Amino acid sequence: MAEEPIRLTQYSHGAGUGCKISPKVLGTILHSELEKFYDPNLLVGNETADDAAVYDLGNGTAIISTTDFFMPIVDDPFDFGRIAATNAISDIFAMGGKPIMGIAILGFPTNVLPAEVAQKIVDGGRFACHQAGIALAGGHSIDSPEPIFGLAVTGVIDTEKVKRNASAKSGCKLYMTKPLGIGILTTAEKKGKLKPEHQGLATAAMCQMNSIGSQFSQVDGVTAMTDVTGFGLLGHLIEICEGSNLSAVVFSDKIKTLDGVKDYIAQGCVPGGTGRNFDSYGHKVGVLTEEQKAILCDPQTSGGLLVAIEPNCVQTVIDIAKDAGIDLYEVGKLKPKSESDIVVEVK
C-alpha cells in the first residue's frame, strides 16, 4: 500500500499570513514606555507599520531590511517554501526596491516529520529566491512544535525612490495587482470543499512575484505602496490612510476575486483571521455586508500590491503593469481625512 502523502497543514494551528497576531494585540505588544532611539539615517522604522525598514547609506542608496515567516498554508512542502519566500521578498518590492539577498528562517518538528520534508521546504524557498534573482545565502533553524518557514531579506533602492505607506496624497486612485480571496480558497481546501477546477488557483496567485513594485517606484506619481497580506485589503489600506492622514473610499463592485470565492463564502469557508481583522479595525470602516466583510478583511498570503497613484500617472502605471502581464485594477480612491472616526467608506 502506498504511503499517505504528508499534509503539512495538519501540523499547524494557523495558516500563512492568517497566523499574524491581530492589529489590536500587536499594538499592545509594540507599545513601549522606553525612550525611542533616534537615528537620522533610519528613513523608515516601525512608526507607520510599513513593510520594511529603510536605512540611508548617505551615498544616494538606501538599504531595505525585512523579515516574514509563517506556518503552512498549503500541504506540499516545496510550494510552502516557495510561497513563504515569495511573501517575504514582496516586502522589498512593496518599498519599491530590489532584493539582493535572502536568509532562511526554519522551525521544524524533527521528531514528527522526516528531514526530507524540511529539505523540500527550503528548496521551495531557494527556488523563489532564484526567481527574484537573489541567493539564499544562509539561515537559522530550530526544533519547533510546528513547521515554520520564511526569510529575512535585504534589498537596495535609490533613496529618493522609496515608496512609504505613509506618503500617499489626497486624490490618488487606488489600484491592486492581484485578486482577493486567497484566505477563502485555502480555507475551502482545508475543509475539503474546494472544487477540482479551483485547485491550484490560490497557490498560483501566492507564487506570483510582486517584482513589478521595483518598476512602479520609478514613477513619481506613485505616492505610496504596500502589499496586502494578513490584515486584508481594509487593514492595509487603513495603515496607508492613518500614516498619510487621509481617508479612503473602496469601490466594492470593482474588487476582483479568485474564481469561486463568493460560493465558498456562502458555504462558510471564511478563515478565522477575517473575524480577528474586523474586530481590530471594523470600527474604522463604514457599513459592510457579510460578503464584503469576508472579502475585504480576508487575510491574504503573498497578496498583491496596493498602489496609490496620482490621476495623471494612472495610464503610465497601467501600461507598465500590462507590459509585465499584470492586470492592474482600480479598487478605490484617497480623500482628505474625514472628521468622523470612519477611515474607509465602502460603496
Swiss-Prot record:
Enzyme class, spelled out: transferase
GO molecular function: ATP binding; magnesium ion binding; selenide, water dikinase activity
Keywords, alphabetical: ATP-binding, Kinase, Magnesium, Metal-binding, Nucleotide-binding, Selenium, Selenocysteine, Transferase
InterPro entries assigned: PurM-like_C_dom, PurM-like_C_sf, PurM-like_N, PurM-like_N_sf, SelD_I, SPS/SelD
CDD domains named among the record's database cross-references: SelD
Cofactor requirements of the protein: Mg(2+)
Subunit structure: Homodimer.
UniProt name for this protein: Selenide, water dikinase
Organism: Haemophilus influenzae (strain PittGG)
